[in-house]
Swiss-Prot record:
Keyword Plastid: yes
Top-level taxonomic group: Eukaryota
Transmembrane segments: 153-173, 205-225, 237-257, 275-295, 324-344, 353-373, 382-402
Gene Ontology cellular-component terms listed: chloroplast membrane; plasma membrane
Protein's name according to its UniProt entry: Sulfate permease 1, chloroplastic
Major site of localization recorded for this protein: plastid
InterPro entries (alphabetical): CysT_permease, MetI-like, MetI-like_sf, Sulph_transpt2
Subcellular compartments: Plastid, Chloroplast membrane
Low complexity bias: start-end ranges: 75-91
Keyword Translocase: no
Reported induction: Up-regulated by sulfate deprivation, but not by other environmental stresses.
Keywords for the protein's UniProt record, in alphabetical order: Chloroplast, Membrane, Plastid, Sulfate transport, Transit peptide, Transmembrane, Transmembrane helix, Transport
Pfam families recorded: BPD_transp_1
Native source organism of the sequence: Chlamydomonas reinhardtii
Amino acid sequence: MERVCSHQLASSRGRPCIAGVQRSPIRLGTSSVAHVQVSPAGLGRYQRQRLQVVASAAAAAAFDPPGGVSAGFSQPQQQLPQQHPRQPQAVAEVAVAESVSAPASAAPSNDGSPTASMDGGPSSGLSAVPAAATATDLFSAAARLRLPNLSPIITWTFMLSYMAFMLIMPITALLQKASLVPLNVFIARATEPVAMHAYYVTFSCSLIAAAINCVFGFVLAWVLVRYNFAGKKILDAAVDLPFALPTSVAGLTLATVYGDEFFIGQFLQAQGVQVVFTRLGVVIAMIFVSFPFVVRTMQPVMQEIQKEMEEAAWSLGASQWRTFTDVVLPPLLPALLTGTALAFSRALGEFGSIVIVSSNFAFKDLIAPVLIFQCLEQYDYVGATVIGTVLLLISLVMMLAVNQLQKLARK
């Protein structure tokens, strides 16, 4: 096999050469790998890194797509049997065997730099074996971690069974029980003044809480992703507290903070602002329990945004506001709508904290979930079924509308 000194390769490609390194390209199927043999003179740190890169390429050669560009150096190439793309270990062994098949010795070239020869000299202290072996181990570990190829029938069976027991059957049971109620009774109970006011309070407070969380959740996610400061990890962990905290404990905490016994509540009452047992307390409770959804939805998407896109916009003369609205915000908008929709859904179904911080009086701050609970306490199962069905249908319509907005935002 004919080999070319790295000086000649460097001169032909216009790149700095690495003294003491010879490369001989070998075509494996549709890809070509440059194998390295090193002189005993030793290499520097940069040369060793280059050597490891070439050795790693030998292990990854089997994954080149058919018809890929080969790394030939206009020298005669030895044709080896094509390896199966699912056998990276065999390809790595061929590369390593070629790189260490014969010891390398120092032979001075025309310009006085040492080159590798195959005349049986002393072997080099540095070879491509560790890098290629490491790559082979990684490929083998990845192959062992592959999930089993389950049959589509098994996958669909498990998925549909889970969805049926966890989602479809409960909703179907509620709708089936609501269908047993006569239509005139259903309409009368669904349009009672108490029920209509409860719908209004529930959806208005949920929308306000979702809008506030949309703004401040976006800002907090931006700060956690873009800035480094003391206590960042503590703040990031504190965002998840509403997930782990029981809703009754959350209601008790809010009632204590905004009540008469805490300085915040005393200050607000001195200013004429009453929080506990009002709609404002309902909104604050909804904000508290639904706040993490916007932050956790926005963080992964913000981390994927490349800083180079903003720098490119700045280099073209765009202002910071123009860069934010035209470059940063469009890819974040679908995730922002998703987080806002999740926050709205969570606020809509909140019960445990609101039942503590609100007065639960009709025509004041009574919400639909609490009204359903009051109907169940009075053994009014028809009223609870009707109000629950109306709440379910309205929520479904609003979620479908949010999904359509997400599709428009992606376009």
